[in-house]
Amino acid sequence: MTEPTLAKTYDPKSIEANWYETWLDSGHFACAPDSKATPYTIMMPPPNVTGSLHMGHALTFTLQDLLIRYHRMAGRDTLWQPGTDHAGIATQMVVERQLAAQNIARRDLGRDAFIEKIWEWKAESGGMIHKQLRRLGASADWQRERFTMDDGLSAAVIKTFVQMHREGLIYRDKRLVNWDPKLMTAISDLEVEQIEQKSSMWHLKYKIEGTENEYISIATTRPETMLGDGAVAVNPDDERYQHLIGKMAILPLSNRPIPIVADEYAKMDKGSGAVKITPAHDFNDFEVGRRHGLPLINLMTATASMESIPEIPEKYQGLDRYDARRQILADLDAQGLVEREEIVENVVPHGDRSGVVIEPWVMDQWYVNAEELAKPAIKAVEEGRTKFVPERWNKTYFEWMRNIQPWCISRQLWWGHRIPAWYGPDGQVFVEANEADAIDAAAKHYGKTVPLTRDEDVLDTWFSSGLWPFSTLGWPDQTAELKRYYPGDVLVTGFDIIFFWVARMMMMGMHFMDGEVPFREVYIHALVRDEKGQKMSKSKGNVLDPLELIDQYGADSLRFTLAAMAAQGRDIKMSTTRLEGYRNFTTKIWNACRFL
C-alpha cells in the first residue's frame, strides 16, 4: 500500500478546509455529557447576529480555541458553547434600512409583520458570523448552537423577569435615561459615545426675587434646558452666597421663582460657583433634585422638540431643541441677561449608531435593583471564587460594582424579548408568564374580567445575555448538561464589557444558580491595534480584515500571530510583516513533515 505524500507546496486554504470538515464530520468538537472525563466549559461570548468577523473577534476566539483544544487533547470533556445575540437595536436598524430602500416604513408595516421580516432576514443572513468563525478554525460544539431569541432562551427570560419582579428586584420607576431622539428609544451607557468638542458656554443672569438689581450668575452649554430649572445650587461653604441660600431666583423668560439651595455638587472654584439644576435633563441634576425634592419638568418630546406645557412660553413650544436654543439666547440677550459667551472643551454624548446628541430624558422605565444583586457578586471575587486574569482588573470590577446604579432594562423597540407585563384600565400592572395568567390575575384584582394592554417595550439585550451561562444549558429545567457544565471554567473577553456583560452574568448567575458563580476565571485580553499602536477604524483606513488575511496567509498563520503576540497587559500591534513571518514558519513545519 502506498503511503500518502504531502504536496510539495503548502496551500493553507485547501488543507485547513479539508481538515476542519473532517473534524466536524467525526464529531470531534462535540461534548460528551455521558463521559466519565472531567468537564471543561467555555461559554462563547455570543457575537451579534448582524456581525461579521473583525480582528477583536479573531483574537478572542483564537484564545478560546487554544484553551478548548488543549483541554480536549488532555482528555477533558470539553464544551465550547456557541451562539449569537439577537442584538436588538442593531438588527432592527439593519432591517429598517432594507425596508426603507423599498420605501416601506416600519410603523406602516406594523409590529407583527415587521418582526416577521426580521426572522426572514435572520434565516437568510443571520448565520454569517458563525460561518466566518469556522473559517478561523473555531472548534465549538456547533450542534449545540443557541440564539438569544430561541424558544428555550425566551422561556428563561420570561421566568427570570417574572420571578425578579415578585422578589421586588424588578420595578417600574420614573428616572433619567439616555434617550436617542432619532432611534426613539432609551439606550445603554455602552451605546453612548462621549465625543470631545468645542462648545459655547453662556453665562446668564437670574434675578433675586424681591430685589431691585441683584442677580446670581450661572453658566450653561444648554440654555434651552433652563426652562426646566428647579433650583440654583451653591456650595454650603461658599461665603459669597450664604445670604442667598433659601431665597428665590426668578427664572428668565418664564418668570417662575425657583429656590437657591445649598448642595456640595456646586463647586466654589468652578465657574461662578452657582449652577442651574435641571433635574429632568441632566443625570447629576437629577440626583440633586431628589435630595431637595425638586420638580421634574420634562421639556422635550421623544423627537427632542420643545413640549407644549405651561412651563414653556408658547413661542418656544414645538421648536426643535437647537432652534429653541437660538431663540432663547436671542431673547435673553435682548433683556440684557447674557453676561458673556466663551468657547470651552466639552464632552457631548452621542448615540453610537444614530450619531445624534443624546438627550437625558425622564420617563417611566423598568429597572433592576442592581445594588442588591451586586452584593454576592462582589463577595465572590473578594473570596477568589471567580478570579480575574490579570488580577489588576479586580479593581475595575470592584469600582463599578460598588457604585452600581439601577439598571434600566426596557427599550422602546419592537425586536427583542417583549416585557411580560399587562396594564389594566386604571394602569394597574400585572406581570405574568403569559396573557392568560395576566387575565386571571386581573380578574382576581378587579373582581371581573377586564381588557388588558400589553407593555410595548422589549428588554435590553444585556438582560438575556446575562443569563447565557445557564440558559444555554437548559435552565430553568434542571438538565443533566446544566449540572455537568455549570459553572464554566473560564470566560475570555475584552475589558470593555466587564461592566456590561461580565458583571451582569455574575449577578444573574449567582442569583438563579443558588449562589454558584458562572465561571471560575475571567481572562481579560488586550486590544488589537494597527502596527503603530493606533485603534483600528474605518475613518483612519487602518482596519485589517481577518477574512482577507486568512485568504492571503491562512487561518493558522493568523491564529499563530495573535496567540504569540497576546502577552498579558499589552495591546497587539498587528502588521502583515508579522503574519508573513508566521506564514513562513507554518511552511517550514510543512516542509519538515515532508522530510520525515
What are these regions (language model features)?
Residues 183, 254, 354-355, 425-427:
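Short Cys/His-rich metal-coordination motifs, predominantly Zn2+-binding knuckles/fingers
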Residues 249, 352-356, 456:
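Active-site cores of enzymes that catalyze phosphoryl transfer or operate on phosphate-rich substrates
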Residues 1-237, 278-291, 295-309, 321, ...:
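N-terminal, positively charged nucleic-acid-binding surface of large information/translation enzymes
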Residues 245-302:
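Extracellular/luminal Protease-associated
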Residues 2, 48-82, 97-99, 180-182, ...:
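Conserved active-site neighborhood of enzyme catalytic/cofactor-binding cores
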Residues 243-246, 312-325:
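A glycine-biased structural micro-motif
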Residues 206-212, 236, 250-255, 424-426:
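Short acidic, glycine-rich loop/turn motifs
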Residues 105-118, 307-318, 542-547, 571-578:
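Short beta-alpha connecting loops at secondary-structure transitions
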